Structures are given as C-alpha cells and as structure tokens.
Amino acid sequence: MILKLFVLGLYFSILLGIGYFASRKVSNISDYYVGGKKLGFWIAALSARSTGESGWLLIGVTGMGALLGVSAFWIVIGEVLGVWISWQFMAKKFKRMTDEYDSITIPDYLVSHFGSTTNLLRIVSATALSLFVIIYVSAQIDITGKTFESFLGLNYYTGIGLGFGIVILYIFSGGFLAVAWSDFFQGSLMFVGLLLLPVVAFFTISGSESVISGLNEIDPGLLNPWGAGGLTLMNLMSVLGLLSIGIGFMGSPQVYV
C-alpha cells in the first residue's frame, strides 16, 4: 500500500508540475485554448490518442476482450481505420481552413466560414459539442472512481473527487498546453504498458499454446473471429457495429482545430 501511495503521489506531482510549467508558456487566449497551434508532432499525436482512448481502451476494450475473445479485435480495426481517415484526409485540411479564419474553436470556424451574423450557429454547435463531450468525460470520471476503488480500496466518490480535482488544477493553470503535455506523459505510460503487458503475460502463462488451449477450455467461441456460434446474421451485424466505432473518431474536435 505504501508503494502504491508513493507511485500515485509521484504521478500527481508530475501532473501538477506540468500544469505549472505550462502556465509559464501561456501569454494569450490562443495559447490557453489551443496551445498557440504549435504543438509538436509527437505531443499532438499522443495527446489526441490518449484523449480518444484513455479509460475506453485500457478498461473498456480490455474487459470487452475478456468477454468476447478474438472477435473483440473488430473494434480495434474499426478504430484504427477511423483514426487513420481522420488524420489522413480531414485533420490537415480542416486545420488549414481554421488558420485562414484564425479560429480557436470549431464554433468559431463555423461562424466565420458561413458568415453567420447571429449567435444561433454558435449556440447550436457549442451545445452539440458540449453535450457529447460531457457524456464522454462522464465516462472517464466513472473510470477514475472505479480505478481508485480497485487499486487503493478508496471510496468510489472519493476517487472521483481526487482524480478530477487534480485534472481541474492543471487545466486551470496551464490550459490546453497543460492538457497536451500531460496527455503526452500519460499516453507514453499507456503505450509502454500496453506493449509490456502481453509480453509479460505470454511468458507468465508459458507460451501461446497455453493461452489458446485455456481459452478453448473456457469457451471455444472465444477463439472464433465471428464470435460464439460462428458466421451468423446476428454476429455479422455485431461485427459491422464494432467496425463502425471508427466513425466517431472522424468527429473528434480535439484533432481538427
């Protein structure tokens, strides 16, 4: 328990330190909201992906893999395709257009591009973004509480307050720069952890044959790429649904401005 608390304290200290140093780089509203649009390649990449994945990937998809087996990989394929399309065909073009209007947010761009003279377009677009972002952030807050509960045995709501409080502190102090730099730090940890976990599991379980035979004993359907029951209409519809997760990544506001 002492080691866990030490690691957690070190982790939070790094996040608060990032917020402090980011605050020293903020000199105008563009710096605060979009980092002056001058993030480096790796920071932008890891920030976007750690925002897009985070608890959804580390907790949600891994749990889904445990329940569905090999067929859960369809959601990974859909995500990779969606992310690739958004970066390859949409993000660069959209950023060029927002730079032309000197837009900081997507509502700013829409108002400038369509020459809106009222606040209706801004209100509608901001409301839509706020609604879906709040839903997504709520899921991350829920994951934070559950992680503290299982990791340290803390009360669920105490974990939410602690984790969310740290996030609010470094966001208020350093704005988007603090978010991007902290995402880079946390994304690097996620990347290394996801690379090491299967390697450690492979050698701990004594090879791939043991994994396959173990899954087969639990449920042969876990090894079927179409899911339990094979290629049926229901499973085909499920696969199409899992692949369609990539559509959501084409509308990620943090990627485009």
PLM regions with names:
Residues 1-59, 171-174, 196-199:
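Membrane-interface "cap" regions at the ends of multi-pass membrane proteins
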Residues 2-4, 62-76, 141-157, 177-186:
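Transmembrane helix-loop boundary segments of multi-pass membrane transporters
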Residues 74-171, 240-248:
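Helix-loop-helix module between adjacent transmembrane segments
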